[in-house]
Swiss-Prot record:
It comes from Saccharomyces cerevisiae (strain ATCC 204508 / S288c). Pathway: Purine metabolism; XMP biosynthesis via de novo pathway; XMP from IMP: step 1/1. This is Inosine-5'-monophosphate dehydrogenase 3. One of its GO terms (molecular function) is mRNA binding. Mycophenolic acid (MPA) is a non-competitive inhibitor that prevents formation of the closed enzyme conformation by binding to the same site as the amobile flap. In contrast, mizoribine monophosphate (MZP) is a competitive inhibitor that induces the closed conformation. MPA is a potent inhibitor of mammalian IMPDHs but a poor inhibitor of the bacterial enzymes. MZP is a more potent inhibitor of bacterial IMPDH. It catalyses: IMP + NAD(+) + H2O = XMP + NADH + H(+). K(+) binds at residues 330, 332, 335, 508-510. InterPro entries: Aldolase_TIM, CBS_dom, CBS_dom_sf, IMP_DH, IMP_DH/GMP_Rdtase_CS, IMP_DH_GMPRt. Present with 26300 molecules/cell in log phase SD medium.
Amino acid sequence: MAAVRDYKTALEFAKSLPRLDGLSVQELMDSKTRGGLTYNDFLVLPGLVDFPSSEVSLQTKLTRNITLNTPFVSSPMDTVTESEMAIFMALLGGIGFIHHNCTPEDQADMVRRVKNYENGFINNPIVISPTTTVGEAKSMKERFGFSGFPVTEDGKRNGKLMGIVTSRDIQFVEDNSLLVQDVMTKNPVTGAQGITLSEGNEILKKIKKGKLLIVDDNGNLVSMLSRTDLMKNQNYPLASKSATTKQLLCGAAIGTIDADKERLRLLVEAGLDVVILDSSQGNSIFQLNMIKWIKETFPDLEIIAGNVATREQAANLIAAGADGLRIGMGSGSICITQEVMACGRPQGTAVYNVCEFANQFGIPCMADGGVQNIGHITKALALGSSTVMMGGMLAGTTESPGEYFYQDGKRLKAYRGMGSIDAMQKTGTKGNASTSRYFSESDSVLVAQGVSGAVVDKGSIKKFIPYLYNGLQHSCQDIGYKSLTLLKENVQSGKVRFEFRTASAQLEGGVHNLHSYEKRLHN
């Protein structure tokens, strides 16, 4: 029998062993040995915990030039992301991509609503003239979702300031034919052109008013600050904002047909920060040409291309000028592409291989599809992705489009794949986002690559996203790293270890041997 070692030498002995426990990511994702893997097929091994989870930074790259405070992204699906979802995704540190299964004008209006929701200096405030009627002002309040319109002499943005119309000025005015010059607040408190954002916020605190109008030396309106935005800055410290305008970041999706060029012009005019080229198979001449056109026409606009599942697909899009990649083909909960088209790839393997290639060129990648819980998010990030796109996880939330309905006593919302027949027939086939996404514009018989269904009410993302955020912090803590950057660096160096899971191991890792139980995700 071998002699028992001195316990004081345990660390030295562990270091002397020929290999670390578990597998490196390269060994785990060897397709020749294990085939294609997805998130349930492996675990990340625990490391040393020497810090509180609250110290974990989840800051990450969305594209070459856009950084987010969280890796959470909402999918451009017509049952997931419209303006309300995009607003709160940005407030909570992520970003939302508004779907394009609607008219270009409607999509641009949704982008505009996000950009106007929270601003630092509002450099293009909506203004009215003294001869605007009270009824028109009320209609504008309903249309734009806010009140507080500066009144200028000529009704133009840089005109001489005459006053401001707020809710309290018009709320109880019954005669809608009255002119705003008769009810507006005259001589409002103003700030001088050139003051800083912090100085403007201090003035707002002192005057206890809702808006601060910024004017030049001649009394002409220059910009505006909002008190509600000051409050939001306190409530949402992680909010994703433009470094220049301080507006919330907003993304949107377009297709790759010629009509999408005019759609994109409207979106850029509305303030779009980043565009996703929405295609189930991104390695197409249509997408390559669209990337080149966008780079020539809107050189400052960030482009996320895809979807891709292989290095070869990624190489074409990177060479064309993509600023980010979207990974996934057939792995979404409502997607049947792999079943119908016999084309796709298990998501874990797709994420690892594409990220390993793209990261060498500084191109951030987004894992899209197959994510069902916090553990899956952690694994996608460990495999190299910078962000994680969620569709099914956010469907059924308060902020997702659609009305709730009841079935068998449960409160539900509709959720459908963009490759479903329902989505393809939402508008005319020409210009429809779904037919464009699946190259089906000219088909007389539509072949579905998705299904329509319903999901249970999940409540508001104002509670759900913080749950994901805290859970991901705890996950990084268990693995032993204080940031996503450190996690990924140590995965690549081989210090972070993995374990392949058999089917029995997967059963063991879930709830088992209970007569009944309740699974509550958060309080």
